[in-house]
Amino acid sequence: MCAEWGKLPVRELASAIGGSLVSGLEDMPARGFSTDTRKLGVGDIFLALRGENFDGHNFLGEAINAGAAGVIVENDTVKPEKFSGKNFTVITVPSTLKALGDLALWWRREWGKKLIAITGSNGKSTTKEMTASILSKQAHTMKTPGNFNNLIGLPLTILSLTSGHSMAVLEMGMNRAGEIGRLTQIANPDIGVITNIAGVHLEGLGDLSGVIKAKAELLEEMHSGTIAILNGDDNATEKLISMFQGKVINFGLGKMNSVRAEDIKRTGEHAQSFDIIFNDERVPVSINLPGVHNIMNALAGAAVAYCLSVSSESIVQGLADFKPLKGRFQVIVLNGDIQLVDDTYNANPSSLKAAIQEIKSFKKTGLLIGLGEMMELGKEASRLHFNAGELVADAGVKFFVALGKHGQQLIEGASKGGLAGAQTCLATNHIEMFDMIKANVKEGDTIFLKGSRGMALEKVVKAIKDHFGVSKGGLVLNN
């Protein structure tokens, strides 16, 4: 591949992003690339990004002091002559954010191997991890690290691809229209996966139709020779199919799906087995996670594998070896036979419903639920939080504590659902939430915590773990 740090001439870098090389030697190779002066290596090119709360142009001095060999800046922000030495590279562009995406697109094309893009309202991170676990059994696979799924994180992930990678599995997130479309242009995927569509990010998208349209940007930007993997059990799929020119493979539990699950069995309190059916093949698999939603995630990953002619053995082993990410329905066994279910990474109405449905099946003496606000729900926020409170009451909870701007609606919904006043509490901070849970939990109980990322309920998780202590055997990563 031509795209290789240490060999890429700065003139080619400038050409890839439509920039003007106003200073520096054209043939000088760019040794590396960074948008963060704290992580910049000697000889790297520093790209000065701008955001709502930061401006990389304010850190050009730090970049130089860290050993940067050049900078990419927006037009008219700096004067090239301020940089001493003719060997120092200065490239100017209209937008450094667009330049980052354009460079990643060029890099992806030069890399030229199979790339899978995954989006959806729920389950995209778990599906990404499952898919990468499967593919890595057969080939060296790059996957999105953490939550690098936006207009900055996805390009940076692509720019870390090397000739040693045979495949890439990238996650795409969004909270407003146009983001998925741009991410798809940059990633140029061979396979696109939409896990499901639900009423999330309503603040930026308006309603479910807006969500469907935003997620469909993935399909609209993919070319006719590509493959779309869609949730055949999702009501939105029919609309999505009409927006795509390529081949479609559906997954789900319904008989009409190309990839489906049969003979589902619970093999432990937090594990299950099932058969994956594809064409005439039946493949028995096991996953160390509970819930139908995780079967759907596994089916999506298996569908990707089938499209890439990955062996059934790799599917079986990849799913068996899969370990979920922190804060995504992790079961932690505490002293006193207390189960703490950490689902604090994020929350929306549909993911909360699926999680509570699964919690209801747990063996437990009593159930305590702590919920943080579900953000970005727009004008529907009050109603959806009230409904979530009713859902909590229906779960047979013995104590419920809520936190956040719409915490009162959660409590009101729980009261409407039948919870007495002594069974509910509206906390004003993380410490209060922890104190209420600590005062009401008994031996053998299960504690379930969930909230939007911005609520940072992992602080409550830490406080509970520190207070009660993790039992011998430690963290049960859903097994």
At which residue positions do the language-model features occur?
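Phosphate-binding loop of NTP-binding sites
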Residues: 11-15, 97-232, 236-244, 305, ...
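Short, polar loop motifs at secondary-structure junctions
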Residues: 73-79, 232-236, 253, 404-408
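Short, basic phosphate-binding NTP loop
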Residues: 2-117, 126-137, 159, 330, ...
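Extended acidic/charged loop-beta regions that coordinate divalent cations
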Residues: 161, 174-202, 238-284, 325-328, ...
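ATP-dependent carboxylate-amine ligase
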Residues: 1-21, 42-45, 55-58, 86, ...
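Short acidic/polar active-site loop segments enriched in Thr and Asp
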Residues: 69-70, 114, 166, 190, ...
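Short gly/ser/thr-rich secondary-structure transition/capping motifs
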Residues: 24-33, 98-101, 149-152, 172-177, ...
